[in-house]
């Protein structure tokens, strides 16, 4: 240090200069001209869809065409997909993910072309090697279904006097298939519900890790396609870390279409002004194995990249990505940016939507370049737009057929059908795995509520690879008087799940997994694809959306060749209840995928740990009050939400939900809410319902009416502090002459599945007009539907004053939420005292409305 006190230190600056090296790749032999012709036909077909339906996307799908065609037709030996168009959902096929979902017209076009090639070859030869089930295939008639609903398509031909038109004869096979605006997992080879928010791509890490965990052959892979704008989203940014953390290696291969063009503007130079925003370096910095291409609209470069990924070292556990420069609005018939007739090619964000008028100048220029290439002539396109619906449909189908007639030229259709059969025959029906692909372990009867061990037990777990054995203690039910909160039971139910299913319950939670008590659920520690494939606890960062997406990726896979049986894993992701909305969007998309899936998939779980106002202890402000209620925002019957208050509710309630989900494909999500504090385990011998498995019924009676006294109404309780304090207040309320029925609300979804006689005995519909609620939740979402008009006025909720709580100690927060014992006593006492007046008010209101 100098005399005046100054000093110098050394700091370091990171450079933004690119560090990319060139390497030569031996281009494999492949049918380039065939791929180019299929690519041109694909582009023309998707443009016909846009032209006649006047909707959809144009620039992105055309930019994707070389990626999609090459990945499907280059062949497994060159790094292309191993798939079978005839059995598109075969469990042992490679997974293709059109994550950039609005680009799906390029796949609809390609799938129609493939379906037509096989259908024509089968018709010509009668050889069943070319037979594809029309129920799964796509055909020319499906061009009428682009962006139309299934209901409308059932009557579209009759409504337009086309039912008997020769052009529409194909509809008689199985109708017209609805082609959605974004990619969905129902679509042939596609295995993702894709969209522009990056949600689709984010599940890819879980899909890849699933194969490693199942001990599958390393040749099985995931190929996912997305664009650079979607990959700026939070989901996909977290996906970068997810894939690296799971060390998926070359099993995961992303093809990035980089054209610096979004919906409205450019990314670099507009959204990001500085040209230092370098995508390849970003992915490399995250730990990915990055390949860049100067022109990903060139088939040689795309196939070279696919081959390079295929030949890469399997010991390199970095996931792989190709950052390929494309042209949004790419057109194979354009020359130096010009189309026939001196029309300038439309590219970049201006080409995003299909915005050209029907049969307008630009469409005609595109069509003429196709006509010149293949020697065909489209009908009616030079006569202007078609306003009559019947004539428009006729012209659409006519010109789709003309475009597809290219398959009959120069042996293109023969080549394509043979190529599809050749690739399809490489899908292995008997893939070696470390697990039985024919048995669903979640149907094991040891998981039924009635068969759960009611006492603490020690089981012997055996490592399925090494044969090592170890004792595991599991306590699904605690003794009354023990001091344990509901969160303490979470690891116990996961341990039992993994013991019974032999390590098929996967945990994907952040580095607070110990805090939310999922840590010991894995019997064999952390998963690693090289050193510990039977571990079920994944290393994960604090990435709620990414973790949930990875969990969904796991559950979306199945080993079963029977589409009605799921053989795979279930998964759980969790965090503090306040943060779980970050997990909602991936699970919302998952719910729809589960609903529509052509094959059974697994069950995804969300743990809303530290829920309720109790989370705000230690003066924290992240309350789990409103946030966990997003898990009610699903179609009824597709999610089971469990809100536990007592340790002994957890196993009974959860395994009741699991029993349903394992047998009802509609249920794809189970949500569990647990609070942070430890409470004394309740003595159920003092309850009206003494059944130790009462939580399995959803709602159960803690205190029933005294039959010898006037009834004062029903108190429905949900949440930990609320119910614990209510139960402890009951003796004082009884001394005060209060005669209420107290119902514990664990899960309305479970309650709704009980016999009508049980529901009427616990909470009949009429009782809802004489009901108050005590809950750690809010007045915005009640634990039971159909509450009476005065329920809100008399209930206790954490948002009683419509304000955010301020935090403090646990006691401070509960008092502020008006869920302390004194507040509960006063509220229930008032509810009882005003019973007659309350009922009279409702009767008067009803009579007044009726008069």
Task: Place the predicted regions along the sequence by residue.
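N-terminal capping segment at the start of a domain
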Residues: 39-55, 257
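Thiamine diphosphate
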Residues: 149-190, 199-203, 213-223, 232, ...
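A glycine-rich helix N-cap at a beta->alpha junction
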Residues: 116-129, 244-255, 285-288, 590-610
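Active-site nucleophile and cofactor-binding loops and adjacent substrate-binding regions
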Residues: 53-65, 96-102, 163, 168-171, ...
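N-terminal leader/propeptide and maturation segments of large enzyme subunits in energy/redox metabolism
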Residues: 124-127, 131-133, 137, 359-362, ...
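Glycine-rich phosphate/pyrophosphate-binding loops
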Residues: 80-85, 211-223, 556-582, 602-604, ...
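Cofactor-binding active-site loop characterized by glycine-rich and histidine/acidic residues
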Residues: 27-31, 35, 42-43, 47, ...
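Non-catalytic terminal/interface segments that mediate subunit docking, oligomerization
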Residues: 406-600, 688-722, 728-729, 734-738, ...
